[in-house]
Swiss-Prot record:
Protein name according to UniProt: Cytochrome c oxidase subunit 1
Annotated compartments: Mitochondrion inner membrane
SUPFAM superfamilies, per the entry: Cytochrome c oxidase subunit I-like
UniProt source species: Chrysomela knabi
Mitochondrial matrix side: 1, 78-89, 169-176
Cited Gene3D superfamilies: Cytochrome c oxidase-like, subunit I domain
Binding site for Cu cation: H147, H197, H198
Record carries keyword Transport: yes
Entry EC no(s): 7.1.1.9
Gene: COI
One Gene Ontology term, aspect cellular component: mitochondrial inner membrane
Spans within the Mitochondrial intermembrane topological domain: 25-47, 120-134, 194-205
GO biological processes: electron transport coupled proton transport; mitochondrial electron transport, cytochrome c to oxygen
Length: 219
C-alpha cells in the first residue's frame, strides 16, 4: 500500500522537526530517554520543550504503526502463488513478528505520554501523588512498551544473520527455519510479560519480583 507507506515516511520529517524544536526552545527536554515523571512534569520542566518532544514521539509512533500494518497486510495478502506461511524466508518472518510487536506495544506508549501531556497542561494527576496519581504507573506503561521495543530492534537481526550464515557457507537453505520461527514468536510473546525487570528498584513486593525474575530467565 504505497500511499500508506508514503504517509508513514512523511510523518517522520515533522517528527524530527518537533524534536529539534524541543531542544531549541526554553531549556530543552532534559528528561533522559525514559521521560520519567516527576522530572518530565511541570515541576521540573516548566516550558514547552517536553510537550514538543511528546508530540514528536506521537508522530513517530503513528508512523511506525502505519508501517507495521503495511508489512503485516502485505505478508498476509500478497505472497506468491502457492507460498505458504511456513515457506516464507526467515527474514520476512522476523519483520512480520517485529511489526506485530510494534502494533501491540506502541499504543501503550502513546497512552502513557498522552497522560503525561494532560498532567502537564490540563491539570490531571495521573502521575502526581498530590492528586491521587502514581509516578510508578508511568514506569509500568513505559516499560510495557520499552521491553518489546528492544526485541523490535533485535528481531530483524535474527532473520538477517540466519540468511547471512546460510549464504556465506553456501548452503541451499537456512538451517532450522521452523525452529527459528517458533523461537522468534516465543520471544516476541514472552517479551510482553517481563517488563517490570526494568524497575526492580522502585519497591515491588517479593512475589512480583520473583515472577518477573523467573519469566525473564525463561526468555
Amino acid at each position: 500500500f504505497p500511499r500508506m507507506n508514503n504517509m508513514s515516511f512523511w510523518l517522520l520529517p515533522p517528527s524530527l522537526f518537533l524534536l529539534i524544536m524541543s531542544s531549541i526552545v526554553e531549556n530543552g527536554a532534559g528528561t533522559g530517554w525514559t521521560v520519567y515523571p516527576p522530572l518530565s512534569s511541570n515541576i521540573a520542566h516548566g516550558g514547552s520543550s517536553v510537550d514538543l518532544a511528546i508530540f514528536s514521539l506521537h508522530l513517530a509512533g503513528i508512523s511506525s504503526i502505519l508501517g507495521a500494518i503495511n508489512f503485516i497486510t502485505t505478508v498476509i495478502n500478497m505472497r506468491p502463488m502457492g507460498m505458504k506461511l511456513d515457506r516464507m524466508p526467515l527474514f520476512v518472518w522476523a519483520v512480520v513478528i517485529t511489526a506485530i510487536l510494534l502494533l501491540l506495544s506502541l499504543p501503550v506508549l502513546a497512552g502513557a505520554i498522552t497522560m503525561l501531556l494532560t498532567d502537564r497542561n490540563l491539570n490531571t494527576s495521573f502521575f502526581d501523588p498530590a492528586g491521587g496519581g502514581d509516578p510508578i504507573l508511568y514506569q509500568h506503561l513505559f516499560w510495557f512498551f520499552g521491553h518489546p521495543e528492544v526485541y523490535i530492534l533485535i528481531l530483524p537481526g535474527f532473520g538477517m544473520i540466519s540468511h547471512i550464515i546460510s549464504q556465506e557457507s553456501s548452503k541451499k537453505e537456512v538451517f532450522g527455519t521452523l525452529g527459528m520461527i517458533y523461537a522468534m514468536m516465543a520471544i516476541g510473546l514472552l517479551g510482553f510479560i517481563v517488563w517490570a525487570h526494568h524497575m526492580f528498584t522502585v519497591g515491588m513486593d517479593v512475589d512480583t519480583q520473583t515472577y518477573f525474575t523467573s519469566a525473564t530467565m525463561i526468555i
